[in-house]
Amino acid sequence: MKAFVSVLGMDKKGIIKEVASVLSEKDINILDINQTIVDNYFTMVMHVDLSDITIELGALKSALNKTGEQLHLKIRVQHEAIFTAMHTI
C-alpha cells in the first residue's frame, strides 16, 4: 500500500529529519518528497510505500501526531487513493 504524508507548519531546523526518522524506524520507504518554504511557512508532501510497515496504520498516525505536536506541526497520513481523489480536479 502507498500513502502520502503531509506536513504543515512554521519552518525550523530538523523537520525533514524528524519525520523521516519516524518513517525509517517503522520500515517505511520514502518514494518521493516535495517541500517548500514560503514566508517561513513549511509544507512537505512525502509519497511513501507502506508494504513493509512494522506497525498498524493507526499507530503510525499516532507516532507522527506525537512528532507533529513536539515540533508544532500538522502531520497527516492519507492512503494514496484518497489523496489522489482529493487533489483531482
Label each residue range with its predicted role.
Residues 1-89:
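A conserved regulatory-domain signal marking ACT and ACT-like small-molecule sensing domains
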